[in-house]
Regions:
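Short, well-ordered amphipathic alpha-helical segments that serve as non-catalytic structural scaffolds
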Residues: 52, 74-89, 113, 233-249, ...
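Condensing-enzyme catalytic core mediating Claisen C-C bond formation in acyl metabolism
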Residues: 2-71, 173-236, 240-243, 322, ...
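Anion-binding (especially nucleotide phosphate/pyrophosphate-binding) glycine-rich loop
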Residues: 88, 92-124
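Acidic-glycine-rich active-site phosphate/pyrophosphate-binding loop
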Residues: 49-58, 108-122, 156-165, 212-216, ...
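Claisen-condensing/thiolase-fold acyl-transfer catalytic domains that form or cleave C-C bonds
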Residues: 2-8, 75, 79-86, 105-106, ...
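Flexible, glycine-rich active-site loops centered on histidine and acidic residues
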Residues: 148-183
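Short glycine-rich phosphate-binding loop at a beta-alpha junction
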Residues: 94-102, 253-262
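Short beta-strand segments
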Residues: 29-32, 102, 132, 157-163, ...
Length: 341
């Protein structure tokens, strides 16, 4: 497992106090999202799959999802989400040291999406690269960004999670075809300044022995997924990484205000909360109107919770994700970003 630097204290009063004094603490300074205007309803999906809409709703909790048009480019949405996040953080693109884009649906195999986003935002001195760990991508990027800030190698980092997954739907597989949507979300990470919370321990893991359980093979580039196996491993791994991250932060389930997990489907989110003994009101569930947009679901969930007033400065938050590979992760943060997402 790859872990963020060891914390020094075990007190649950504040994550900032659990890190050595000489470490530059990293924090979220903003969150923003960008959605395609097109919508694909579950009624439309049901008609195409020749099943009932109720069948979809009962198994996924998804009523509709954003859907990009055939001529729209993922890099444009990633750049717009990034621009909104920069504006909300009061940071200019030229100040960025690093641009990370988590995606498995880039416009081209090469160049990566991140250099295109960096160019669009005027981040001409920033390093830029993509992270392809599927639905875990955004959390993986946050871990890398936090490590760069904490080590002094970067001050401002833009983290983007963006995917157009509807283009990869396998319409022959009704169990997975109803799940996916398109979206982009972005966050600006920088040094904690007392007003923007702090990023605590992030624990990442992977198991390639299950790689064929969910995959997008070449050249077909259509999703192949064993839903029951994904469900079983997703719940177990996200619960495990949540508890590990909490232990490393010196916190418990009761210390956390919100649990923000990858929005795979409503059943997984519900089962995860039940396994951890968390009341539903503390678990963010926004999949009904977004669907599963892979690397974009965590920023979507954070922005949704902030917009609804559930995510406030000072809130202690667990982040968790699970994706193809398998890859997974869990982390603990104190929130500080504010404003309309």
């Amino acid at each position: 497992m790859l872990e963020s630097p060891d914390v020094a204290g075990r007190a649950a009063s504040a994550l900032a106090e659990t890190m050595p004094a000489h470490v530059t603490r990293a924090a979220f300074h903003s969150i923003a999202i960008e959605l395609p205007p097109g919508r694909l309803s579950s009624a439309e999906v049901a008609a195409r799959l020749e099943i009932s809409e109720e069948w979809i709703l009962s198994r996924t909790g998804i009523h509709e999802r954003p859907m990009a048009g055939p001529d729209e480019r993922l890099s444009d949405y990633a750049a717009r989400a990034g621009a909104a996040a920069l504006a909300r953080a009061g940071v200019d693109g030229s100040e960025l040291d690093l641009v990370l884009v988590a995606t498995i649906s880039a416009d081209e195999v090469t160049p990566n999406t991140a250099p295109l986003v960096a160019h669009a935002l005027g981040a001409h001195r920033a390093g830029a690269f993509d992270i392809g760990s599927a639905c875990t991508g955004f959390l993986s990027a946050v871990a890398i960004a936090a490590a760069a800030i904490e080590s002094g190698r970067a001050r401002w980092v833009l983290v983007v999670g963006a995917d157009f997954i509807t283009r990869m739907i396998n319409w022959e597989d009704r169990k997975s075809a109803a799940l996916f949507g398109d979206a982009a979300g972005a966050a600006v990470l920088g040094p904690a300044d007392g007003e923007h919370g702090v990023i605590g321990p992030i624990v990442l893991g992977a198991d390639g022995s299950n790689g064929e359980t969910i995959m997008i093979p070449n050249p077909e580039r259509k999703i192949v997924m064993d839903g029951p196996e994904v469900y079983k491993h997703a719940v177990a791994r996200m619960a495990e990484s949540t508890l590990t991250a909490l232990d490393r932060s010196g916190m418990t389930i009761d210390d956390i205000d919100l649990f923000v997990y990858h929005q795979a489907n409503a059943r997984i989110t519900q089962a995860l909360g039940e396994r951890l003994g968390v009341e539903p009101e503390r678990v963010v569930d926004c999949i009904a109107h977004y669907g599963n947009s892979s690397a974009a679901t965590l920023p979507l969930a954070l922005a949704s919770a902030e917009r609804d007033g559930r995510l406030k400065p000072g809130a202690r938050v667990v982040l968790g994700a699970f994706g193809g590979g398998f890859t997974w992760g869990g982390g603990v943060i104190e929130w500080g970003a504010s404003g309309d997402a």
